[in-house]
């Protein structure tokens, strides 16, 4: 299996990180990724990463979760498909071999449907330990997105988190500046964007719009459109996680901070 290269060639240089650089990510393969989120982002010209797992009720409830054919269509529309593991198991409870097997399963499912092998990863429930970092490094992932902890207190219904500072954070523990849900509002989104300056990047972790099976991370379509309108009105550069490679050299990891949670 080979990963598609969305980075820079040896003759290219990294682009300067613009202020208001925002990364959009969506976890769990909710049906709204295909029916609502993807079409809206396409109209706005925004990039995004959709992290896919076959855990939760993905295999049994196609009213609330995307099909692999729909995932392929999201890829065809230019969005990134990232790896969220086979079973959505907390990575800090798995051995390296167990996590690698979960990662490879999603890789193979992507290949079966003509989707590039993922080069980015989203930690299920933000849980991570040393063996998870080792597994991702061994598999050649460029970037892995985590949640808001341990820097910010965990709230099951969303909240603020640290902005990503490439000079500080290891690329396999990219923090979320916000996890929208019932405990997260418009002022929190504005706060995240305002932190995205001086080389720092706001990474946002969404789930379903709406998240029918998981109301604790639900965002309504009306809320979501308000958020996206703000990003557009404020001339934000909105990208997928893989596109960080245009601005950040993921191979430079010496001295970068790695945090585990919980």
Segments and roles (model prediction):
Residues 42-143, 147-160, 166-175, 199-211, ...:
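Metal-dependent polysaccharide deacetylase catalytic core of the NodB/CE4 family, i.e.
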Residues 35-38, 68-72, 133-137, 190-193, ...:
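Short amphipathic alpha-helical segments and helix-helix/interface helices
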Residues 24-29, 182:
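DG-centered beta-turn motif at the end of beta-strands
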Residues 29-35:
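Short acidic, Gly/Ser-rich segments with clustered Asp/Glu that frequently serve as metal-coordination loops
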Residues 180-191:
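A Trp-anchored, charged/polar loop motif used as the substrate-binding/catalytic surface
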Residues 96-101, 186, 218-221, 225:
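Non-membrane alpha-helical structural segments and their capping/turn regions in soluble enzymes
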Residues 23-24, 80:
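Hydrophobic "anchor" residues on beta-strands that sit immediately upstream
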Residues 2-16, 48-52, 58, 111, ...:
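C-terminal domain-boundary segment and adjacent tail
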């Amino acid at each position: 299996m080979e990963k598609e290269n969305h980075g820079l060639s040896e003759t290219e240089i990294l682009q300067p990180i613009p202020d208001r650089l925002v990364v959009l990510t969506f976890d769990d393969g909710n049906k709204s990724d295909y029916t609502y989120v993807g079409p809206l982002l396409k109209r706005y010209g925004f990039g995004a990463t959709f992290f896919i797992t076959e855990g939760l009720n993905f295999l049994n409830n196609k009213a609330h979760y995307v099909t692999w054919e729909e995932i392929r269509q999201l890829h065809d529309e230019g969005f990134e498909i990232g790896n969220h593991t086979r079973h959505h198991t907390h990575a800090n409870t798995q051995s390296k071999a167990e996590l690698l097997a979960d990662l490879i399963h999603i890789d193979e499912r992507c290949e079966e449907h003509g989707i590039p092998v993922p080069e980015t990863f989203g930690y299920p429930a933000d849980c991570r330990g040393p063996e998870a970092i080792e597994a991702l490094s061994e598999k050649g992932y460029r970037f892995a997105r985590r949640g808001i902890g341990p820097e910010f207190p965990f709230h099951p219904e969303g909240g603020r988190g640290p902005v990503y500072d490439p000079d500080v954070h290891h690329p396999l523990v990219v923090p979320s500046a916000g996890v929208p849900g019932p405990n997260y509002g418009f002022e929190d989104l504005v706060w995240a964007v305002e932190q995205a300056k001086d080389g720092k990047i706001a990474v946002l972790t969404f789930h379903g719009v709406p998240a029918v099976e998981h109301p604790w991370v639900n965002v309504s379509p009306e809320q979501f459109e308000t958020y996206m309108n703000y990003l557009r009105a404020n001339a934000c550069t909105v990208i997928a996680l893989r596109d960080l490679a245009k601005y950040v050299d993921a191979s430079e990891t010496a001295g970068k901070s790695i945090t585990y949670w919980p």
